[in-house]
């Protein structure tokens, strides 16, 4: 490579000159009198600068580690190789090493990409497989990053400079500490000042040397850095061992004094009993948050539960003695230790916390369980449970302060269950957070009514129900359950019996003149009071019968509000009486229904309009044919999608074939009473004698019009129309259907085309 190593001093030589010059620098470092001065001069200011390329940056979990660094290096090299295959190149950088730390500067722009002070660099490793690559770990706690760098030449000089940098900084700090030590020695010494100074020195050594020692003591480098630096390495290793001993002492002191070993091992039990508060604080080191579920991790059940028990032993030494008398283990582990008897007993208590201590199964006695509760609930909850186990437990403190129950779960879970049991009948049904799935069985059985009450809260009618007296919420629950059974008459009784309870407004609301008004006084009638529940459920669940009912209502827009309920009640049950009741309503509106506005939908109009038009034929006195057809039309009206049109067309054209000679005179005489206007009579008179071709063409138009009106196209009407075209009298239907199509093409053409044919042809031959 033609890349050169550049420094602020005379370091701009190729590899051949840099190789012999490196030992000279190391020889200078041997002399302790020159090392610090030379290194300070070397790293002062901008320091040393090396040309390199940035392989990549990777987040790493730890501050140091050979295996971690190697894995990260291989990962970044693989990513760089993949990028190179796509035409990407590594970023060219300058690595600047100075007293301020390591700076990564972009070669082109000169911008400082990354800057890491010395105290943030925790590990430096040279790649074993590539002598031109190295990496270092930097960053704060939890934010460690591994920077992989490919140097232009050998990476060894750069790594040596980094070691020199850390050594210089360490020596400078050490000298400063020595000066402080001398100044402190010259001053008047107080009692224990020397011990404090030694502790400070050790702490300073930790601060200064930990990074340095862990940096190079854990370095993943081969023994290339050998002869000149062995003495220094030995010194660093000695300091490292000293630091390790100090760290171990600092680590073991909290272990021994805080009694954490009592949590993990049963050996130092008396220490935990003498220092229970330290045991609890040390236990938090391993388990930062108290475990709400003591059975979540069985292997750690002992330390997890021993800590609260030892913490509770602060406030109740007498009950600690009682628990000691009831168990053969010390109080440090309490009744919650690995003893299977107390473990099983606690399990029974957790699973049977419904206020029935006698239901605890197994050979575990009741008094020992009571002592257990006393031991575990020393934080103020035992005063509630020791007397009568659940008698004094009031639900209001639990409802007011749920976090207190979560802070120390071993004691409050029992009070939680007792308060839930005592407040099961209250209107405020608060389900506590699922601390454990096992006591949930008793909770579910005890709060079945409360769960139903919460389930009914989904509807807006329940909050007013709570405003009623305390005994009332049980009644709306059964009413809501009855409403969902689909029985319309079932909820009528309870809804009427509720009186002022605002449960009925959403049901009767849709049938009031104002659709969204929730007042119950709008529908007090006997006819409507029986119907709102049956119509409420289709509206809520979006079923089609209720929608069709409201779609058909525009045809009866003029009648007053009381008649529609009587009309709509049979229509939902689809009884024959419905159409008989619609006939008196359809008669007065015959003249209006023949030419309604075209905005009416064809789906909503055919049934009421057919009923109204079918009611018109009885006006002429000799209508025997229509009387025979009325019951058949009524039954076909019940099924609008049936074969009604097929029957009408067949009968109509059957009459055509029989009555061909007398059609014209009978039609002229009977068109006025059939309910048609003068425009239709003139239209029929004009159409008499039209050639057969036009008649056939009109037949085809009428057939298309019938097919448009009837959603399911029937082949029978088409054949009937084709047979009717052979007759010369078939022109009666076709012009008539055209007339209706011109005046009202969307709605009335179907019923009007059926009845006028039936009425004029039924008179002569009936």
Curated annotation (Swiss-Prot):
Changing residue 53 to Q: Abolishes LDLR endocytosis. This is Disabled homolog 2. It holds the Pfam family DAB2_SBM. InterPro entries: DAB1/2_SBM, Dab_PTB, PH-like_dom_sf, PTB/PI_dom. The gene is Dab2. It comes from Mus musculus. The modification N-acetylserine is found at residue 2. It comes from the Eukaryota. Residues 230-447 are annotated as: Required for localization to clathrin-coated pits.
């Amino acid at each position: 490579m033609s890349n050169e190593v550049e420094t602020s001093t005379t370091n701009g030589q190729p590899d051949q000159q840099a190789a012999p010059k490196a030992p000279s620098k190391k020889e200078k470092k041997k002399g302790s009198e020159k090392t610090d001065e030379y290194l300070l001069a070397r790293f002062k200011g901008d320091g040393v600068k090396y040309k390199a390329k940035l392989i990549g940056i990777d987040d790493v979990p730890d501050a140091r580690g050979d295996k971690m660094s190697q894995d990260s290096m291989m990962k970044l090299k693989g990513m760089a190789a993949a990028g190179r295959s796509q035409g990407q190149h590594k970023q060219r950088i300058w690595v600047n090493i100075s007293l301020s730390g390591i700076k990564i500067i972009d070669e082109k722009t000169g911008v400082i990409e990354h800057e890491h002070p010395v105290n943030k660099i925790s590990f430096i490793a040279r790649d074993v497989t590539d002598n031109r690559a190295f990496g270092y770990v930097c960053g704060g706690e939890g934010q460690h990053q591994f920077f992989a760098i490919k140097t232009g030449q050998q990476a060894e000089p750069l790594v040596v400079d980094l070691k020199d940098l850390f050594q210089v900084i360490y020596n400078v700090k050490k000298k400063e500490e020595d000066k402080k030590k001398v100044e402190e020695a010259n001053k008047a010494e107080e009692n224990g000042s020397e011990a404090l100074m030694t502790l400070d020195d050790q702490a300073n050594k930790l601060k200064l040397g930990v990074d340095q020692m862990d940096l190079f003591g854990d370095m993943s480098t081969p023994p290339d850095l050998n002869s000149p630096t062995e003495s220094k390495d030995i010194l660093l290793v000695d300091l490292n061992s000293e630091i390790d001993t100090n760290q171990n002492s600092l680590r073991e002191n909290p272990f021994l004094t805080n009694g954490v070993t009592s949590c993990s091992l049963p050996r130092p039990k008396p220490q935990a009993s003498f220092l229970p508060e330290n045991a609890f604080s040390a236990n938090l080191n391993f388990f930062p948050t108290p475990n709400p579920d003591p059975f979540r991790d069985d292997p750690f059940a002992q330390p997890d539960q021993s800590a609260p028990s030892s913490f509770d032993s602060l406030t109740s030494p007498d009950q600690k003695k009682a628990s000691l008398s009831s168990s053969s283990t010390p109080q440090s582990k309490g009744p919650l230790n690995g003893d299977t008897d107390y473990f099983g007993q606690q399990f029974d208590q957790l699973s049977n916390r419904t206020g029935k201590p006698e239901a605890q199964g197994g050979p575990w006695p009741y008094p020992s369980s009571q002592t257990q509760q006393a031991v575990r609930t020393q934080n103020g909850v035992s005063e509630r449970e020791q007397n009568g186990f659940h008698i004094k437990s009031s639900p209001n403190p639990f409802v007011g302060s749920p976090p207190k129950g979560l802070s120390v779960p071993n004691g409050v879970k029992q009070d939680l269950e007792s308060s839930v049991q005592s407040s099961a009948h209250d209107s405020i049904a608060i389900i506590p957070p699922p601390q454990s799935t096992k006591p949930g069985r008793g909770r579910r059985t005890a709060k079945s009514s409360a769960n139903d009450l919460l389930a009914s809260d989904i509807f807006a009618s329940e909050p007013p129900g709570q405003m009623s007296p305390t005994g009332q919420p049980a009644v709306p629950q059964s009413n809501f359950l009855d409403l969902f059974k689909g029985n319309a008459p079932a909820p009528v009784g309870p809804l009427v019996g509720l009186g002022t309870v605002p449960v009925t407004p959403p049901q009767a609301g849709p049938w009031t003149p104002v659709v969204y008004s929730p007042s119950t006084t709008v529908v007090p009638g006997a006819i409507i009071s029986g119907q709102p529940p049956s119509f409420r459920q289709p509206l809520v669940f979006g079923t089609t019968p209720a929608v069709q009912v409201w779609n058909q209502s525009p045809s009866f827009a003029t009648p007053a509000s009381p008649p529609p309920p009587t009309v709509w009640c049979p229509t939902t049950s689809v009884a024959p009486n419905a159409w008989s009741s619609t006939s008196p309503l359809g008669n007065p509106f015959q003249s209006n229904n023949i030419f309604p506005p075209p905005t009416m939908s064809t789906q909503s109009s055919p049934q009421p309009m057919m009923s109204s038009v079918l009611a018109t034929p009885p006006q002429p006195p000799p209508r025997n044919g229509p009387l025979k057809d009325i019951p058949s039309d009524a039954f076909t009206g019940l099924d609008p999608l049936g074969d009604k049109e097929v029957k009408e067309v067949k009968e109509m054209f059957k009459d055509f074939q029989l009555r061909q000679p007398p059609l014209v005179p009978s039609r002229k005489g009977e068109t006025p009473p059939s309910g048609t206007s003068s425009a239709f009579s003139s239209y029929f008179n004009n159409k008499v004698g039209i050639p057969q071709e036009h008649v056939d063409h009109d037949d085809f138009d009428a057939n298309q019009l019938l097919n448009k009106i009837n959603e399911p196209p029937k082949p029978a009407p088409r054949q009937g129309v084709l047979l009717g075209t052979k007759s010369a009298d078939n022109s009666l239907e076709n012009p008539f259907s055209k007339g209706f199509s011109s005046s009202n093409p969307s709605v009335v053409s179907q019923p009007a085309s059926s009845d006028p044919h039936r009425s004029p042809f039924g008179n002569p031959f009936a």
